Amino acid sequence: MDTATQTLPVARGAYRLYAEVVPGTGPPVVLMHGFPDNIHLYDRLLPHLAGRRPVVRFDFLGWGRSDKPASYPYTATNQAGDLAAVVGALDERLGTGPLVLVAHDASGPPAIDWALAHPDRVQTLVLLNTYYHWTPTLRRPPAIALYSTPVIRAAARAVVRRRPDLDRRLYTWQVGKFIQDPGERHLLVPQLYKQFQPARPAFWRLNDDLLGAVLARRRRIGDMRRFGPPVRVIFGARDRYLNPHVARNFAALFPHSELHLIDGAGHYVQVDQPQQVADLIAGG
């Protein structure tokens, strides 16, 4: 951990969320990870934001260094509660004020849910290769499709329980496809996989929730059209799944939006182009 980084205690009912804060000035930036990753997704981005804004990053319940209660309902709706707990702890540390919310991948639904409920707290909503509701151009990566499709997901999970080597190879292949730079891929994927193994129950439960979550949130399209704060849509243009069509759909729905398609970046846009992404975030 960097010497400037401070641990932020966050209680989530009886459980504990792991969160870190880097000091700075202005509205705090809240970085949220998706699946199947954790706060280390922002390791390359953080040095480019440090000192420019206060930055908090945290592991959702069930992930990384946060608690992992057994049989917990790990859903997008409950992740919005995780975000609310982090905001509450941040308010106690820094005082209540506007926030820059940064969502990537599966953190799109909880981040947008919270933003729609608390527009007065949002300085800027930043969307990095994420999703919220079903659209015709939204695609699931192969591993996510395997684990989220009813009927076949139970068989797939049974296989990887018996074959941990196959689980590791599938993870390495799929997450590796999200990173453009071979050197960074070689460093980051094993680090993420090490913390993924104990997070697998949360991963599978979120996959169970995935299709219903995106279908249900089509009911929020009207709320998205009425959302007042600025929205900055920053997508890696090489992402085949959460692709430029998804980005353009977000930009069309939110009335005060900017669209930035980053050439040379894929699904992990903050890993592929950290300086450019940090500059766009800090500008909000």
Task: Locate the predicted segments by residue.
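Active-site pre-Tyr helix/loop in NAD(P)-dependent dehydrogenases
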Residues: 35, 131, 256, 268
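Flexible "cap/lid" subdomain of the alpha/beta-hydrolase fold that forms the substrate-access gate
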Residues: 3-5, 15-17, 41, 56, ...
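Alpha/beta-hydrolase fold catalytic core
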Residues: 1-29, 50-53, 87, 92-98, ...
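Conserved catalytic core of Hanks-type protein kinase domains
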Residues: 48, 253, 271
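Conserved HGGG/HGGXW glycine-rich cap/lid loop of the alpha/beta-hydrolase fold
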Residues: 21-67
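Conserved acidic functional residues
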Residues: 34, 105, 271-272
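Catalytic histidine-centered segment of alpha/beta-hydrolase-like enzymes
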Residues: 265-274
